[in-house]
């Protein structure tokens, strides 16, 4: 009985963290290496709708390790990703100001230590949203990254927290 509260708090913390990030939707995948046992190695393309900016979707391609380790979630995926964000509808901000820089999405790409991250930055001078993807580890990250920008129409001002 004494373990219920810590478990409940951990579950609540996980749900709060999960709800803050964008959700991915797999658009497609291509196999790159055939694996006799387990899924093949592949490149996947996922779509992420920006949770705080309606009308912007980011597409991220990345390698996904197959085989038995990949199927069990024990494999470490490569730290290489590419990103392209586009205006997919009318851009709006829901009346809430954005942080100058904010993590939009993160996903575990190894059992414990490595994450793929997508960060949104605001270039207020050029009225543009800049999106960066990179991976990091507990000890050191990878310098490999990819960046894209979405210009916001001139009549729409990006609200930024001061």
PLM regions: where:
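C-terminal motif of bacterial Sec signal peptides marking the signal peptidase cleavage site
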Residues: 17-18
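Residue-level signal for mature regions of secreted extracellular proteins and peptides
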Residues: 12, 51-52, 78
């Amino acid at each position: 009985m004494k373990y219920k509260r810590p478990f409940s708090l951990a579950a609540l913390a996980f749900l709060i963290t999960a709800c803050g990030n964008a959700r991915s939707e797999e658009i497609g995948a291509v196999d790159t290496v055939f694996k006799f046992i387990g899924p093949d190695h592949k490149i996947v393309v996922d779509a992420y709708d920006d949770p705080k900016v309606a009308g912007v979707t980011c597409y991220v391609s990345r390698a996904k390790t197959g085989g038995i380790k990949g199927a069990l979630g024990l494999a470490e995926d490569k730290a290489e990703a590419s990103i392209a964000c586009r205006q997919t509808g009318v851009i709006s901000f829901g009346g809430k100001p954005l942080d100058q820089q904010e993590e939009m999405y993160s996903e575990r790409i190894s059992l414990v230590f490595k994450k793929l991250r997508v960060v949104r930055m605001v270039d207020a001078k050029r009225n543009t949203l800049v999106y960066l993807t990179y991976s990091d580890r507990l000890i050191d990250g990878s310098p490999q990254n990819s960046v894209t920008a979405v210009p916001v129409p001139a009549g729409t001002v990006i609200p930024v927290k001061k």
